[in-house]
Amino acid sequence: MAKGKRTFQPNNRRRARVHGFRLRMRTRAGRAIVTGRRRKGRRSLTA
């Protein structure tokens, strides 16, 4: 039985562009995400 390829192919540049800090700061909702994580005391705010 043939299985498909693994779906997670790590790529740091894509990770940063899709989930990164600059992207989060671009929208109001993204800033809300970062604010919430700051308030919660998360060590890592974004990817």
Swiss-Prot record:
GO molecular function ontology, one term from the record: structural constituent of ribosome
Domain of life: Bacteria
Disulfide bonds: none
Family: Belongs to the bacterial ribosomal protein bL34 family.
Gene that this polypeptide is encoded by: rpmH
Entry-linked PANTHER family: LARGE RIBOSOMAL SUBUNIT PROTEIN BL34M, MITOCHONDRIAL RIBOSOMAL PROTEIN 34 FAMILY MEMBER
Ribosomal protein as UniProt keyword: yes
Keywords: Ribonucleoprotein, Ribosomal protein
Tagged with keyword Transport: no
Family annotation (InterPro entries): Ribosomal_bL34 (IPR000271), Ribosomal_bL34_CS (IPR020939)
Name the record gives this protein: Large ribosomal subunit protein bL34
NCBIfam families named in the record: rpmH_bact
An individual GO BP term: translation
One CC-aspect GO term: ribosome
